[in-house]
Amino acid sequence: MISVSSREEEVREATHGVAQFAKGDSIYHQGDVANQWFEVVSGMVRTCRFMADGHRQLTGFYYSGDVFGVDGHRRCESAEAVTDVVVRRSPISIPGDGMDDAPQPFERALESARRSIFLFGHRTATNRVAAFLIEVAQRSELAVGVQLPMTRSDIADHLNLTLHTVSRTIRDFAKKGLIELNGRQHLRILDPTGLRRLAGDATDDGGEARLLGHWTSASGVTQ
């Protein structure tokens, strides 16, 4: 017979601490009970919503330090590991029961939502792809080398564009000298000012310096 304390410990282990997921693993599914939120320790996570007609809307990419899974009673979307992932999980608190003890994670979750809303505010395919590449470069903490392991299909679903449109737009950027493609897995931003202009000047004032010299590993440039 399992004691009450043993059951409590099992529940605690299931909702606290660090967990690892292999590339392609599901972290949770749309419709699951939402009893914990997650912080990315390493790797990349994507969240997506599946519509009744089978269409997938990719709602966000989450990097190290990002928070996701701050939902209501039920999950409104699924979360999947884009790469091998390590996450830190914590129980979702109710108002008045510890939420005030950890405001920063919730603020970071809201910031991720604001970034997505801002990205979708761009009207044209050119605007969206340019803004996406700028965001990826700016979020890198490395002077050189930004891994972007999502596929081009992922980028298309995230930006609500077709795969063909994303591929064509990236090629157009290269032809115009805005970026340099290095094989099929890397690109370099050559003209930050021009790319910012195409994005509608949608980056912060200090962003241009961080774009110079950045290399983006883009399986996103592969299907």
What are these regions (language model features)?
Residues M1-K23, Y63-F68, H73-R74:
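Cyclic nucleotide-binding regulatory module and flanking cytosolic helices
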Residues G24, N35-C48, S64-G65:
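Glycine- and acidic-residue-biased ligand/ion/polar-headgroup-sensing regions
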Residues I27-D32:
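Short phosphate-coordinating micro-motif centered on Lys-Gly-acidic
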Residues V45-Q57:
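A short beta-strand-loop-beta hairpin characteristic of the jelly-roll/cupin
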Residues L58-E111, R115:
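Cyclic-nucleotide recognition modules
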Residues M99-L163:
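Polybasic "coupling" helices that flank or enter modular domains
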Residues A137-Q223:
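Phosphate-/nucleic-acid-contacting segments
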